[in-house]
Curated annotation (Swiss-Prot):
One Gene Ontology molecular-function label: rRNA binding
Species annotation: Ipomoea purpurea
This protein's name: Small ribosomal subunit protein uS14c
Coiled-coil parts of chain: none
Name of one Pfam family that matches: Ribosomal_S14
């Protein structure tokens, strides 16, 4: 189980990313439109002005049961070992263990 402070930090990052999403998108569009290098540098400065935690690359998908940030399956929203346990216990309909 991940510490609750890490999960709260991730939620805070998600809120910041949603808040500054339009600012980042508009400045990226302006950078691609402008031809002069000096004007591009102005927009690069605007792109760097939002907080670092508002960048979408700083977000992690977390397992919604344990909060584990690694080995997540997007389809289920679970980490690998929790997914395996749930499939073994027949808690996920349609999911079967592979055997050969």
């Amino acid at each position: 189980m991940a510490r609750k402070s890490l999960i709260q930090r991730e939620k805070k990052r998600q809120k910041l990313e949603m808040k500054y999403h339009l600012i980042r998108r508009s400045s990226k569009k302006e950078i691609s439109k402008v031809a002069l290098l000096s004007d591009k540098w102005e927009f690069y400065g605007k792109l760097q002005s939002p907080p670092r935690n508002s960048a979408p690359t700083r977000l992690h998908r977390r397992c919604f049961l344990t909060g584990r940030p690694r080995a997540n399956y997007r389809d289920f929203g679970l980490s690998g070992h929790i997914l395996r346990e749930m499939v073994q216990a027949c808690l996920l309909p349609g999911a079967t263990r592979s055997s050969w």
